[in-house]
Amino acid sequence: MLNFFAAAPKGFEYSLAQELTEFGATEVKESVAGVYFTASLTLAYRITLWTRLASRIVLVIYKGSCESAEQLYNAAYCVDWPAHFSNKSTFSIDFHGTGGFLNNTQFGALKIKDAIVDRFRDDDIERPNVSRVDAEFKVDAHFRNGVITIAMNFSGPSLHQRGYRSTTGEAPLKENLAANMLVRSGWQASPSTLLDPFCGSGTVLIEAALMAADIAPGLQRSRFGFEHWRRHDKAVWQEIVEEAKARASLGVKRCEIKFYGSDIDSRLVALAKRNAENAGVLELIEFNVADALTIAPPAESGYLITNPPYGERLGNVSELLQLYYQLGDKFKKEFGGWKVAMLCSDIELVSSLKLKADKQMKMFNGALECAFNIYTLHANSTRRDTPVLPDGVDIADIAPAFANRIKKNAKLLEKWAKKEGIDSYRIYDADIPEYNVAVDKYLDYVIIQEYMAPATIPEAVTKRRLSDVLLALPSAIGINPNKMIMKTRERQKGTSQYQKLDERKLELITTEYGAKFKLNLTGYLDTGLFLDHRLTRRLVGQKSKGRRVLNLFSYTGSASVHAALGGAKSVTTVDMSNTYIAWAKDNFALNGLQGKQYEFVQSDCMQWIRDCNEQYDLIFIDPPTFSNSKRMEDSFDVQRDHVNLLSSLVKLLSPTGELVFSNNKRKFKMDIETLTKMNINVTNIDDVTLPMDYKRNPHIHNTWLITHA
């Protein structure tokens, strides 16, 4: 009897152990990401050809304690390598694990390589050559907890590569993962009608058809690891292969199970057909191009087993939440009597089905941890009587308090915005504490920003509430889900609010009191326009006529644009970021503003203030709450440093000049006493700079008008 280890993805151990036991293996023992077992050579061949779950099978040649590099070398040297492979065959070492004396896998592989080469030489045999790519004989070594296991790769290339796949879709499902879905769902034990409405390249259906037609999954593989093993019995292997071919031929003819696959992408359906044809099961599967939400059950009962789109796969989160919710609704209404088994990595999407799972398991799709949930659908079951709206769900069903509030807000603010002459504004700002998000409307798009939840609220609760928000929004405010953009906002430190989120740009032009501004809805956490400063920008414009205007920490220069449109004699725009200076220039161009009177400066604002000798009639400054950018000489804290900052700025202010100072620190306290002693007048103007759409959040910013005493 020979000792083996069958490797598989994490989460497969139980299913794989059962499969090996059914094959007739003995001493079956589950381990991490695999199963140890004992088998005869004949049975090992059969397992290699027929396993649907294992990724790799290795023949254990040596296993023992190892506490030094010398012991590692000796362990490998004691193996009779010339009895295992010819010196004419190339070989390679695949080494895994570190610890103790061994902190480098490359060193471990080198020690074993040296031992193998020395063993050949000491037996007066010319040494074999190492090949890092496509070696003919592969040694697999694992070091863990002071134990070294040296094995031969018995199966060869990964066993999930059946040989029928021509190319893959955007998000391919590994064949052995599809097989495990079929096993754990219960379908393999009692096969019946099978439907996959997101079939992609057809993997789930093809694996199921191979099972039902008694076709060995390894029958089309062209290479196996044991082919260059000296103890390989070609006659026995060939006999097992011929037997499998005969069973396959008979199995296809006898198979009476019906398989149905569909996908909305016609290219993937064509690919699925090619793969099924390559696997020899095309005649068993009916493929169609169809939307999963429109298909009808092909039988009164059966299994719906699928791997639908999710975050790491395809689609944006808002659309996916809508899709999952409507899928759950369809399953409940139309698939009574069916079992549904679904693989998904996103708990929010799974919860949006609004179905109660009979079983919940973990599986890994590559390195990605996924939930595999099984649902039993009962006949004549409905979730509700009210219909699903075309672009979303019934608002009475999901987060009614949130839905009703934002619907009311949107209706009120839409009329106000038209009257104001703006098309970008906030329609919800954590009005209801349980739904801790801000929702901003930019033309016909909305951005949803999730605030960091208190640590006392369980993550599962916050995720469920967020998914309910995203589900309720489309019908509540009449927006297409594909025009919803989700962002997560936390407390910003330093320049984190300006870090890029997405290389892809979704750019729009928004209008504000006659000014035009370029927006980037996806590139950064912020869009290029701070909506809460809308009235402050207008105030700057109203105060600018005939004046020399300075805008510091200018961001994208929107206040500078208002100043220029307001008739400023000159406008100087200063920001540390080249990106935002370029953006400010774009905004000026959008408004037809050009000329030498408009100056753009890329510089550390604090240093620029210290170096400046000019005088200005109007200064606007909206500094960050805190910054420690590498480009700045010192860190900046608006609470700590505002007195020094304002006293320096007043020196640049003409005798009749005005300084508009704003910041977003919620608990900011202006040191009026110290500034008054410095002959500086300070007046809070929050009441005239807080827009209507931010009245629900009066602490969003604070604004001050500062002059010489």
From Swiss-Prot:
Belongs to the methyltransferase superfamily. RlmKL family. Its EC number is 2.1.1.173, 2.1.1.264. Pfam families: Methyltrans_SAM, RlmL_1st, THUMP, UPF0020. This is Ribosomal RNA large subunit methyltransferase K/L. GO terms for cellular component: cytoplasm. Specifically methylates the guanine in position 2445 (m2G2445) and the guanine in position 2069 (m7G2069) of 23S rRNA. Keywords: Cytoplasm, Methyltransferase, RNA-binding, rRNA processing, S-adenosyl-L-methionine, Transferase. It is found in: Cytoplasm. Residues 43-154 form the THUMP domain. Its main location: cytoplasm. It catalyses: guanosine(2445) in 23S rRNA + S-adenosyl-L-methionine = N(2)-methylguanosine(2445) in 23S rRNA + S-adenosyl-L-homocysteine + H(+); guanosine(2069) in 23S rRNA + S-adenosyl-L-methionine = N(2)-methylguanosine(2069) in 23S rRNA + S-adenosyl-L-homocysteine + H(+). It is an enzyme of class 2 (transferase). It comes from the Bacteria. One of its GO terms (molecular function) is rRNA (guanine-N7-)-methyltransferase activity.
